[in-house]
Amino acid sequence: MLQINSRLAVIDGWLVDTVKRKPINFRSPEVRLLLPNDDDYKKLSQQNLVDWTRLKKDSNSVLVGVKSMELFKHIKLVLREFFLLEDGRIILKRIRSKLRYKVVKKLTCKCCRLYLPKWGTVYIHPMLKDKEKPLAGVCEFSLDVNPDREYPLIEINVSHQYIIIEGFLLYLNERRLYRWNDNNLRGQVGLTKWAHLRKTYNPVNLDILYSLNSNFYFVKDDLLFQLLGKRVFVKFCKVMENGKCGKAPLWYRVKRTTTAKATHIAYAISNSTAPDSFKSKNNDYRFIVREKPIVENTISNLDYSDIKKQQFTEAEVVKRKISADISQIENVHTQFNSQKEKNNIRVNKVSSEVLDQISKFPVSRVTLLLMSAGQDKNYIELVEELARRLEKICIEKTTQSLEEIRDTFQANPEMQARFDKEYYQSIEEYKITLELIKEDLLITLIKQMENMWAAEKKFSTEEEYVSPRFLVADGFLIDLAEEKPINPKDPRLLTLLKDHQRAMIDQMNLVKWNDFKKYQDPIPLKAKTLFKFCKQIKKKFLRGADFKLHTLPTEANLKYEPERMTVLCSCVPILLDDQTVQYLYDDSIIPEFEATSSYATKQSKCGRKMSLQMEPDLLFQEAIRRMRHLTAYDVLRRNYIAAFEELYMGNCND
């Protein structure tokens, strides 16, 4: 270290303000103010100082390692969190939202911030040499999350999501831990499923932590700390607890501390959130401690095996007591619980790699599936926007229909109050049903839409007039006079065409009509010219969940298939040589959806007029029946598909 004056010194090529404990850029104007003496300034200019601009030019990352242990003894270090991206760069955590690269690893280290006016900000940290002892107070660690590990994701009525990590129940919507033995949670989940989940996963570790005399609980899985986000730095302390016969046994407790003295990271839980029976304890906080230390501290006089033994011994006793208490609650409630549980509870497996990509919960199963499949972020955002628009259309349509039923009781406030209980419950239920329909249909609808843009079968796209009457287009020979396709092998062509014209047709790659005999269902085509010049008829078909059209079933093969629905489609009939008829339809046009017939509409209107003349109780029952019908899965499913078609046709017309 070369002392320039009482304040400035040069340490391994770095100019350091030893009073403010920070590096100073030699090119900064403040250097001249700190060195009014010309001799001192000349002395400084003769030193081989580090060029700060090279730090940014030579590195794609904002975190730069410096091999100077002496330098970091004389400057202040602060703890910062960084992301290691898949392209190899290291960036500051808070600017992740601006980037499109996947985060490979999260790391935290003590560093010093340097600001370069033209180049931005970099952070320097000590880069240790081989066989060199770690610098006291400089800690570096990263959260080590296994991307392939899977966790149970519990969904309650679609909109509430929980995850279980090492026996801790985390409410993802608020990123908050929950006690398992909680009356509100038990009521939300339902007693039967609450008991089943407890036996399967036993997520009672927060209950155990609140019951311990110790104020800490070790956790190995770093995903818990990653999802909770807010972390504190702690260390273990020895305390003397009053025991029997005046003895004072040794006891370990966790205490918050500075980053320089910290041995572990932890998540702090205030005792104010604990049950009333635990609030009398003297401790303000309890800590979920990451089992792996920040840095291996060889100087520490603490025996971590004793600390872990303390937790294990105490936790086993508490766990048995809590399990017995919960079992007793289950038995008592089971005897007196006769209510049917209506909540929709689902448990799925989700990997930590997928969880790391989610910024906000709850997240739909559709999004989870797309993330698991490795879909592009922009594609997922488009699908989510489409889902929101479809949901909005369906909710507006269904709510309008329900409001019409509700208006029936405007003249009878007592009956309306009675109906409103069912009304608001139906609104909640059909919104959940819509979410389930989205999971069942949305990806399928999108795939079918994409398939519509691709030809089902590739035909020749040549367009050529063989004669003023006959045109070859889209792989077909079209009779413009009769406005229909004609078989190239039709014997009538012998009289209608000349030899050279027939020879021209033979050289073209046209559709072989015998191939149509292989198809039992209508054939989708992308043939704009064919459908432009040929007469089309309207015909009813069945449309399956795969969006393909099928012929209507006959009495011989009639069977109930709820996933199919009747549609009216424009098509071109062709008569084959065996006198059977095949139908060609444009697969870029979505057929008309027969939601309700005119007769059914009239019947509905008549039924509404008749309902006004019913007795109040009969009117109420009829209104409930109609409301149940409107919010049924099959009806909402048809509305969802109709909304999708509406958006699709709107985009096509644009």
UniProtKB/Swiss-Prot annotation:
Its main location: nucleus. Keywords: Centromere, Chromosome, Nucleus, Repressor, Transcription, Transcription regulation. Interacts (via OIR domain) with ORC1 (via BAH domain). Interacts with SIR4. Interacts with CAC1. SUPFAM superfamilies: ORC1-binding domain (SSF144005). It comes from Saccharomyces cerevisiae (strain AWRI1631). InterPro entries: ORC1-binding_dom, Sir1_ORC-binding. Pfam families: Sir1. Residues 322-654 are annotated as: Sufficient for interaction with SIR4. This is Regulatory protein SIR1. The gene is SIR1. The keyword Chaperone does not apply.
